[in-house]
Amino acid sequence: MFLRWSPKKAALAYPVPPAPPTAVLVPWFRPAGQVRVFPKGWNAEAAAFAPAAIVGSWPQLAGLLPERIPSLTHAVIVVASSPDQLLTEARRNRLWQAFRVPIFEQVVAEDGSLLAAECEAHDGVHLESEKLSVDPRLIEVEACGCGRATPRLRPAGERTRAVAAYAR
């Protein structure tokens, strides 16, 4: 079996390097190191890879909620193409209940380039690129628990409250 490398796609930015064996279920990234891309999503080949981490969109990961994935020990990374697709608190809790591993979120472009990413402090999604357009009411500028001072989108519950407060 040959893996095709596409120079136009970025490698996955794993939240807490180094990346363990990771199954990427979206075609936005190129394989690198222990990161393998399964563009057709979760299937027998992805299961045989026995990933310690899984990367996918919310619909893909929601489809895996009833699955038992014994090798999954490190993380679930939810990728979205816009901030509007980030997880609600309820969806995040469903992933945690099903997989019992840390949940991370990333906003990425179709070429896999990182636009925003959640850190290990899980206190919002750090803005990584000026290409990402975000409602200023949803941005937190105070230092994060991870030590970074970059602006970030507030956590899901706080994003909802900020918009609701503005609407009053």
Regions found by a protein language model. Give the residues of each.
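Active-site glycine/GP-rich loop and adjacent strand/helix microenvironment
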Residues: 1-168
